[in-house]
Amino acid sequence: LIYSDPRDDGYAAGAVMPNGPMRPRDGVQRGSVEDMPLYPGDPLTPGVGATKDAKRLAVADAKTITKIPVLPISYGDAQPLLDAMGGPLAPEDWRGALPITYRLGAGPAKVHLKVKSTWTLKPLYDVIATIPGTTEPNEWVIRGNHHDAWVNGAEDPIAGLVPELEEARALGELLEQGWKPRRTIIYAMWDGEEPGLLGSTEWAETHADELRTKGVAYLNSDTNDRGYLFLEGSHVLEKFINGVARDIEDPETHLSAWKRDQQAEIAQGTADQRKDARDRADLRIGALGSGSDFTPFLQHLGVP
């Protein structure tokens, strides 16, 4: 049983819905328990695209499907279960904000867990638009953002999807005016990101041989927010990104995005970070981990 404690994102962190953004008593966290560090994407087709005719594993043989049944619950439902636990006191940094004494167990509480899962296969729908390049058509620049969401998706993914659609609209206007790109540009809206990077991984696996030779760069967005420029990626793109950031004006301060980010680092960073921000001519790009649709391109196929 997984629950989000109010200490993390409930009433202890601020006003709860509908009076604020924090999780209410009956709110349940949504997320994936697929073992994505092992491999993301369709659990039944590791390493190959999940096309109609792809050979599939049996569910029992899929290594990324958890063998322990998992059910997320609200902290309202978790409270009586935790309150009934006995045993020694939990360490202080393990304790949450519920009005109970947090203990490690065991105790008299017994829980009967009944999980009903549907194992039917369902199609996912990636939306792909391609603008052929004129000079280097076999060099692909791919721009992606997922379109699926756990609920309504105002922040995740729509905050990233709307800018991507606006970019595509702008390029469409340029095409009508006679502009053509040097390299092939592929715009992608991925399905199934939330359950396990499904749409992007399966598309990348289907086109793996082409991407290894033609993939120049993959540009990903997901949950864009108001504020400062924040970038992570391959350091080979650091010089390019700094040039772009110098060309973009921040609408609030009318500084360049580069200058505003530098000032934020100087104002908010540690002593070492402030010195680094003053001394460096370029802003640093953070290293990528995983967790969004860039994963199959960077970690699996080596596309920056």
Give short role names for the model-derived ranges.
Residues L1-D26, T134-W140, W150, L165-L175:
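A conserved hydrophobic secondary-structure block that centers on an alpha-helix together
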Residues D5-D9, G31-P37, T101-R103, A159-L161, ...:
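Short C-terminal domain-edge/linker segments immediately following a structured domain
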Residues R23-L89, E136, W190-P304:
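Metal-dependent peptidase/peptidase-like ectodomains
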Residues D35-E155, R169, E173-Q177, A277:
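Soluble metallo-hydrolase cores and metallopeptidase-like ectodomains found primarily
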Residues A106, Q177-R183, E210-K214, K259:
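Short helix-terminating capping/connector loops at secondary-structure junctions
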Residues Y125-V127, E139-L175, P181-E205, A217-S221, ...:
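Extended, hydrophobic alpha-helical segments in both membrane/secreted and soluble proteins
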